[in-house]
Regions:
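Acidic anion/phosphate-binding donor-loop and adjacent secondary structure
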Residues: 78, 129-148
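Carbohydrate-associated surface elements
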Residues: 106, 126-129
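Nucleotide-activated donor-binding/catalytic signature segment of Leloir-type glycosyltransferases, i.e.
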Residues: 149, 177, 186, 191-223
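Nucleotide-sugar-dependent
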Residues: 161-164, 212-216, 224-250, 256-268
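A charged, aromatic-enriched C-terminal amphipathic alpha-helix characteristic of glycosyltransferases
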Residues: 282-288, 298-329
Length: 331
């Protein structure tokens, strides 16, 4: 009961905060536009203040509005009253926007289904990107000799989109039919993960490391684990997501294992480009079989790594995508 009361209190306190933030952006935005002599206004997808505040600034100044949608807005799992505001404002904001940037083709298709084919003329796909210089070159088949214990690595935050799939992997490793540990590198505190039901054990190690260390950690893995969950409260989010860590994984030089629903764009993207082993059913036996094959089939590992690098340089290179972004923001 105490936890429920605390959650209700947080919700009530959040109501004035979102409106105050929107008001601050709407008040300061026009001043900044005039001071900088800005040609466009860019609003980034969030839980409301940036999207709505950017829209109000656009209306006040008459400057074109560009949206950068890292995630869905309407239909996302947003704190109250963010979901209500998103349902009201997203159609209005999308109608007025000059350009809409999304991070994958799946999200573009989603918005075309939601708002009609004409919205597609406004949408530019710019995939999540990193600079490849942070990663070593020619990593194919590096450290692929047989080992007494293999390492499955997950890097990044853990919350509802990944949670049940990570728990499923932990359960599979607990059967001792796979000669591997799961090494989690997450900025989430161990207490937070424990509250989610994730704790250290015989087959699970929980670590933390600076962002600068992540390339080295990913390069040392035997498998890079990329999960999305089934039966969540935000299926639209699951189906349109391309997690930011995918970009890092593609260039890390180690095979990727995607454990996610068949309906997700992530699974479709991986299959189209053959850059990852994919388990698209919530099936523990299938997950176990694919992991064991991926650990021992060196030709398959090499093929996936090579295709991952090709996909990175085709869609995820920051050198290329920065030019696309610049062109989109200035046209």
């Amino acid at each position: 009961m105490a936890v429920k009361r605390i959650n209700w209190l947080k919700t009530l306190l959040g109501i004035p905060i979102i409106f105050v933030q929107m008001a601050m952006i709407a008040r300061a935005g026009p001043k900044i536009v005039r001071k900088l002599k800005a040609d466009n206004i860019v609003a980034v997808s969030d839980y409301g203040p940036a999207m709505i505040g950017g829209y109000i600034t656009h209306k006040k100044t008459g400057k074109p509005l560009i949206l950068f949608m890292f995630d869905l807005y309407k239909g996302n799992y947003l704190p109250f009253p963010g979901g209500i505001l998103a349902s009201i404002y997203e159609p209005i904001i999308f109608r007025d926007a000059k350009e809409i940037i999304v991070t994958n083709e799946g999200t573009k298709d989603f918005y075309i289904k939601r708002y009609g084919k004409n919205i597609g003329d406004k949408i530019t796909v710019i995939y999540n990107s990193v600079f490849q210089e942070n990663y070593e070159k020619d990593l194919v088949a590096k450290n692929d000799n047989p080992k007494s214990l293999y390492s499955i690595v997950y890097t990044g935050r853990i919350y509802w989109p990944q949670l049940s799939s990570i728990k499923n992997l932990i359960s599979v490793l607990g059967t001792n039919n796979i000669n591997a540990d799961l090494n989690i590198y997450s900025p989430n505190p161990k207490k937070y993960l424990l509250n989610l039901g994730i704790k250290e054990g015989k087959n699970v190690k929980i670590n933390s490391a600076s962002p600068e260390k992540m390339p080295e950690i990913q390069e040392s893995a035997d498998i890079l684990f990329l999960p999305l969950s089934w039966h969540t409260k935000g299926q639209q989010i699951i189906d349109t997501a391309t997690p930011g860590k995918l970009t890092d994984y593609l260039i890390a030089g180690k095979p990727i294992l995607i454990y996610a629903p068949a309906s997700s764009f992530l699974v479709k993207y991986a299959r189209e480009n053959n850059f990852a082993a994919v388990v698209d059913q919530e099936n523990s036996k299938q997950l176990e079989e694919v992991i064991n094959k991926l650990l021992t089939d060196l030709d398959w590992r090499k093929e996936l790594v090579e295709n991952a690098r090709k996909t990175f340089f085709k869609n995820h290179s920051a050198k290329i995508n920065s030019k696309v972004l610049q062109k989109t923001l200035t046209r």
